[in-house]
Regions:
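Terminal helix-turn-helix DNA-binding modules in bacterial transcription factors
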Residues: 81-89
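Residue-level detection of the helix-turn-helix DNA-binding "recognition helix"
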Residues: 41, 58, 62, 81, ...
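Key DNA-contact positions within bacterial/archaeal DNA-binding proteins
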Residues: 51
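Short, Lys/Arg-rich nucleic-acid/phosphate-binding segment
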Residues: 36, 68-76, 80-81
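Extreme N-terminal segment that seeds HTH/winged-HTH DNA-binding domains in transcriptional regulators
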Residues: 1-35, 89-118
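A short alpha-helical element within helix-turn-helix/winged-helix DNA-binding domains
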Residues: 35-46, 60
Length: 118
């Protein structure tokens, strides 16, 4: 697993780690039950503070994407793909609701798309 970090990005590093792992799970690169790097290993690999990785892992655990069994054993949870699919569905529903609000204000779907693509 290769975590891509943009050190110049405004997105915090811990958030980039979360986004990378979520992406790899949704693409099937990381599979249910698969072990991932420990906090220390990832920190060394990325050349960052272990507390940054810990923050990312804490968020992933809260989202039920990973589980840490001991300080060295962290795994992708069994229902991770479903958790991410549910999140995607929720986000899409919110986007559709926003599009409906904009059409009620008089914008066509084409105008909305044009503005988004700017």
């Amino acid at each position: 697993m290769n975590i891509n970090i943009d050190y110049k990005s405004r997105v915090p590093i811990y958030e980039q780690i979360v986004n990378n792992i979520e992406k790899y799970v949704s693409l099937g690169i990381l599979k249910e039950g698969e072990q991932i790097m420990s906090i220390r290993e990832m920190a060394i690999n990325l050349g960052i503070n272990p507390n940054t990785v810990k923050k990312a892992y804490d968020i992933l655990e809260q989202k039920d994407i990973i589980v840490t069994i001991s300080t060295k054993d962290t795994y992708i949870t069994k229902n991770t793909k479903q958790v991410i699919e549910n999140k995607i569905e929720k986000e899409i529903t919110e986007i559709i609701e926003k599009i409906n609000e904009l059409t009620k204000l008089g914008l066509t779907k084409e105008e909305i798309i044009k503005r988004i693509e700017k």
